[in-house]
Amino acid sequence: SDSDALKKLDKKYADFTNNGSVFENLDTKQSVISLSATDICDRWLNPYAQTDIEKGKFKSADGEKEVTYMTSNETYMKTNKATAVMKYFSQTPLKMMVIMPNEGVSLDDYATDFTSLEYTTLLDSVDVTKTAKAKIPEFSVSGDKSAENITQIVEKSGINSSFTADRSRYKNLSRSDDIAFSAMYDIAPSLSINAGGIGGTQSNGDKAELEKRTKELSKTDVTVEFNRPFMFVILDNESDIPLYMGTFTG
């Protein structure tokens, strides 16, 4: 009933994504608009010490760049295509998987072929008795892109009945029997990963690292240095359902 409702919603979501208008293509006469969003801000379960932070080189597509590496002991995973580690957050029931394709495998090719089988193979490869020495660069992902229409992608994934009135099942939302989603949009949020933890629109406390490590890092047989383009996944602790996936290319 509020003719300005869409404008208010647009403003609120634009602030969240550090972007301008994101709902320009929506029809103001549509009666139902459903949004799902998250803004994760947390520190690491095992904090870094200042001695764990050092400068190093990263091999980006544009050549070598200087980055800040964070060194820690992390859960180790591996497939015949990639190497990965898992990090845990202290308050939210989430963890972060960082995945680097093997030498000779481009990130684009790996991401294109990244299937549920590869994902579960990584998770199943965990040996709880072993850890790796992981060197992960601090990085950030900009959320300055406008909303992307992902209707066709969702339909092709098998959830096509949601967009067809005679096949959708949303009767509890209305007295009408012909409700269906007209479109689905995705907006990439801003995200930063550093020694303090993970941050979205809020600061994650980038001064949260310890002045001095109280317990020395364990000696490991494996060292994984994420010094070339990689993927990362924010996933649920218990179900391993991915909530956010992205890439860092330098």
Regions found by a protein language model. Give the residues of each.
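Internal alpha/beta scaffold segment
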Residues: 101-128
